[in-house]
Amino acid sequence: MARVPRHRRLVLPLLCLLFQGATALLFAIFVRYNHETDAALWHWGNHSNVDNEFYFRYPSFQDVHVMVFVGFGFLMVFLQRYGFSSVGFTFLVASLTLQWATLLQGFLHSFHGGHIHVGVESLINADFCAGAVLISFGAVLGKTGPAQLLLMALLEAVLFSVNEFILLSLLGVRDAGGSMTIHTFGAYFGLFLSWVLYRSQLEKSRHRQSSVYNSDLFAMIGTIFLWVFWPSFNSAPTALGDGQHRTVVNTYYSLTASTLSTFALSALVSGDGRLDMVHVQNAALAGGVVVGTSSEMMLTPFGALAAGFLAGTVSTLGYKFFTPILESRFKLQDTCGVHNLHGMPGVLGAILGVVVAALATHEAYGDGLQSVFPLIAKGQRSATSQAVYQLFGMFVTLVFASVGGSLGGLLLRLPFLDSPPDSQCFEDQVYWEVPGEQETETQRPLRGGESDTRA
């Protein structure tokens, strides 16, 4: 493989050092512990240690953190020669995003007295932002370099934070599990980014855009981690007590239903009755996405099952039929199929939230209406008005994602960012020391010459 020019080899370390130096300076100026983290403030109030929010929120934070770094990272290792990059760049991009999101979300949500005040909830919210960025990463997986990904993360985190603030704080939209703010935003930001970065000569690397037995097995590890911890992901920001409990129950049942529908549809559409690991690794997770908005609401266990089954069905059909259409007709190369796992289920989840919000009544929620729909409980909105705001929130998210992704694509076209050439996409050796291996251009896909597109 040709030696990389010196100026291109310096781009990544310079960007890493520049970004870290800038965020460290901003942390020194603005970031302080909140009242539950600061030693003096906590003990001044004579609180019991067991009342500290850490003990209520940390288990959820730990699960979400594992999802971001292990779940997303390993879900994307299906590419036969891109495992180092899938896990390694996930590690890099998420680490930058966590710092940057802490600042952005802090300025918007917890800035007072001239400082940003952080605690365990700040860590959870930063992880959510990182999740959206990694969803977008899936759309351009294998076609972008690490320097490009760092700039993508910087831009996307800004737009994510602004969109989240508009929806949750200004519009009063309910979206605890992020069907809109995380999944829909991340998916369509990534899709429009990929559309702008379209590669007409990607066929030169198509033989690498496939899996082998072991890479699929490792990707399945990511799926299992995500599947098991998804109830924590959706419930982490919800009100303690019945709201968090209900969110876990709804997500749990929705995931089981999406798994069953995925296995059923995968066997049906294969032609020979065999299962496709692409479907199982991804569409089985759609149940967690589709109830993100409504999981804290009175969706009912039956509603969760129905939503999950529909999401698994739509996602599986998307992988089989819709992804090839996106590339052939719309020139949209979605490496991981994020449109099928996060995009369409995210939009379905937003619509489900509209319906469930419209049905909210004092009789159904009792005093719990205050924690789920505070504006309805205070008489400031009717259930119908809340539903309209939920729908409007979805359209705002789509606008932010599409415009932001398009602008991000233009930014990532800057020549000094060291994008891999068309003939070297989906290849670890471009950016990593790969021990004991030499590139073998004669490797062919194992699935009848078809490339994988999944999330």
Curated annotation (Swiss-Prot):
The chain crosses the membrane at residues 11-31, 59-79, 84-104, 122-142, 147-167, 176-198, 217-237, 249-269, 280-300, 302-322, 344-364, 391-411. Expressed in kidney by connecting segments and collecting tubules. Also expressed in liver by perivenous hepatocytes. Expressed in the forestomach and the fundus of the stomach. Expressed in duodenum, jejunum, ileum and colon at the level of villous (at protein level). Specifically expressed in kidney where it is restricted to the epithelial linings of the convoluted tubules and the loop of Henle. Also detected in ovary. Expressed by hepatocytes and dermal hair follicles and papillae. The keyword Transmembrane applies. It holds the Pfam family Ammonium_transp. One of its GO terms (biological process) is transepithelial ammonium transport. It catalyses: NH4(+)(in) = NH4(+)(out); methylamine(out) = methylamine(in); CO2(out) = CO2(in). Residues 434-455 are annotated as: Disordered. N-glycosylated. InterPro entries: Ammonium/urea_transptr, NH4_transpt_AmtB-like_dom, RhesusRHD. Changing residue 342 to L: Decreases expression and/or localization at the plasma membrane. Glycans are attached at residue 46. Residues 413-421 are annotated as: Interaction with ANK3. Residues 32-58, 105-121, 168-175, 238-248, 301, 365-390 are extracellular. Its main location: membrane. It is found in: Cell membrane; Basolateral cell membrane. Belongs to the ammonium transporter (TC 2.A.49) family. Rh subfamily. Ammonium transporter involved in the maintenance of acid-base homeostasis. Transports ammonium and its related derivative methylammonium across the basolateral plasma membrane of epithelial cells likely contributing to renal transepithelial ammonia transport and ammonia metabolism. May transport either NH4(+) or NH3 ammonia species predominantly mediating an electrogenic NH4(+) transport. May act as a CO2 channel providing for renal acid secretion. This is Ammonium transporter Rh type B. It comes from Mus musculus.
